[in-house]
From Swiss-Prot:
The chain crosses the membrane at residues 14-34, 72-92, 162-182. It is a multi-pass membrane protein. The keyword Lyase does not apply. It comes from Prochlorococcus marinus subsp. pastoris (strain CCMP1986 / NIES-2087 / MED4). This is Cytochrome c biogenesis protein CcsB. Required during biogenesis of c-type cytochromes (cytochrome c6 and cytochrome f) at the step of heme attachment. The keyword Ribonucleoprotein does not apply. One of its GO terms (cellular component) is plasma membrane-derived thylakoid membrane. It is found in: Cellular thylakoid membrane.
């Protein structure tokens, strides 16, 4: 029991929580540096050649679970430990502080007033019930009052004591939601060509929705670099009597019935070419060896003496580069332009078909994340509210009225309010 109390005392300290948060933040940063969820052999091949920090090879990456940090045993343990730390801090510090604040403190002796941060007193000349008048004045200004025969206690801003507790609850929900999302979320990357559709099936409700790419276009900078990718998607379901078009672009996902659809990438997936009066739809593939965002394929051209040519394209408007892989000569074919002759074959580019790269993610932890951030924001705002207290005591022997005040924050602002209230009570 003693060991358990020492353990709770240790983990409920602010220093321990801060160190744990720093550890989790650094671990999350490492997770963005090291690709997550790839095949283990990829880590072994890559990090054996280029070890992390010069000494952590591929086998050690896997052994330390750095290939799946967010679902690793040690990362989840640190999240659980932080939840326990926050809960322990709430029960050891915040809740007792709230309970203490809910209890009225009664100052019967004027000597106690001199221990307060703010104090004033003055002699009563006229015969009047100043306690009753002070009670009425403070109630009108929104103070809560506990009144006795010759004294009263007043307080305002008690909701500020709830702020830290609400923040801790929000953080705990955030940690639990994040861990839940790491295990339960599903993600799929899908490229859709214009007019191509995809079925989305919700197994829990046995509902099916078809999405179809109606339009896709790229906004470019003045120098031709991509600025924004935009997809218009049609959502259709006879079962749900649904037919509507939604738009997604980078950093503006579509949220639909628990799914989130992100605009992630694009590609040139197909081209339609006429070669010697015959139409061909050719599928292109990325060629990272040549450069980023370059797609192409290898074909044979020529009626008798056939030669291999590499077709490449780097944007949705063309032109198409035709390269002879033997002598490296190049020709360009422009969209809907006159055909050109290469090795006795006539080529013309009829259509360029881009694809929209979408990431479709099902993350049931999203409601927990939104709830947690709402609680954290509300709790933070409440924490900014100062808790102010005022005590008033009338000494019948000396015929003096004592007024004292205390505030847990913004003492300078409360001092101005305190002096103003004191003058109003004196002149009331």
């Amino acid at each position: 029991m003693v060991i358990f109390k020492k353990f709770i005392l240790k983990i409920s300290s602010l220093r321990f929580a801060i160190l744990l948060i720093i550890f989790i933040a650094i671990s999350s940063g490492v997770g963005t540096f090291i690709p997550q969820g790839n095949d283990q052999q990829e880590y072994i091949d890559f990090y054996n050649e280029t070890p992390i920090l010069g000494f952590i090879n591929g086998s050690q990456v896997i052994r330390l679970q750095l290939d799946h940090i967010y679902t690793s045993n040690w990362f989840l343990f640190s999240l659980i430990l932080l939840c326990i730390s926050l809960a322990a801090c709430s029960f050891r510090r915040q809740i007792p502080s709230l309970k203490a604040a809910l209890k009225w403190t009664d100052y019967k002796d004027e000597k106690k007033f001199y221990k307060l941060e703010l104090i004033t007193n003055y002699e009563i000349i006229q015969d009047a019930d100043h306690i009753l008048k002070a009670d009425s004045l403070l109630r009108k200004k929104g103070w809560n009052i506990s009144k006795f025969e010759n004294r009263l206690s007043a307080r305002k801003g008690l909701e500020g004591k709830l702020g830290p507790i609400i923040v801790h609850i929000g953080l705990i929900i955030l940690l639990i939601g994040s861990a839940y999302g790491n295990f339960s979320s599903q993600s799929k990357e899908q490229y859709l060509r214009l007019g191509e559709s995809l079925d989305l099936i919700n197994e829990s409700t046995n509902s099916r929705v078809k999405i179809k790419l109606k339009n896709f276009f790229i906004e470019r900078e003045s120098d031709g670099k991509p600025k924004q990718f935009i997809s218009n998607l049609e959502f259709f379901s006879k079962q749900q009597n649904l037919n509507e078009i939604k738009t997604t672009q980078v950093n503006q996902p579509i949220r639909f019935k628990g799914l989130t659809i992100y605009q992630a990438d694009w590609s040139v997936s197909n081209i339609v070419m006429e070669i010697d009066s015959v139409l061909y739809q050719l599928q292109l593939k990325p060629i990272p060896e040549i450069g980023d965002q370059i797609w192409g394929l290898l074909i044979e051209l020529g009626r008798e003496n056939k030669k291999n040519y590499l077709l490449t394209i780097d944007n949705e408007n063309g032109p198409l580069k035709v390269s002879n892989i033997e002598d490296f000569s190049e020709n360009f074919v422009y969209l809907n332009n006159n055909p050109i002759e290469i090795n006795s074959s006539k080529l013309s580019l009829k259509k360029i078909i881009p694809s929209s790269g979408l990431i479709i993610k099902n993350d049931p932890s999203i409601p927990f994340i939104y709830l947690s951030f709402t609680l954290i924001i509300v709790g933070t705002i409440l924490s900014l509210i100062p808790t102010n207290q005022i005590w008033i005591l009338f000494n019948e022997n000396t015929n003096k009225l004592f007024i004292g005040g205390l505030s847990n924050r913004n003492l300078l602002g409360f001092k101005k309010e305190f002096l103003k209230l004191s003058d109003e009570i004196k002149n009331n």
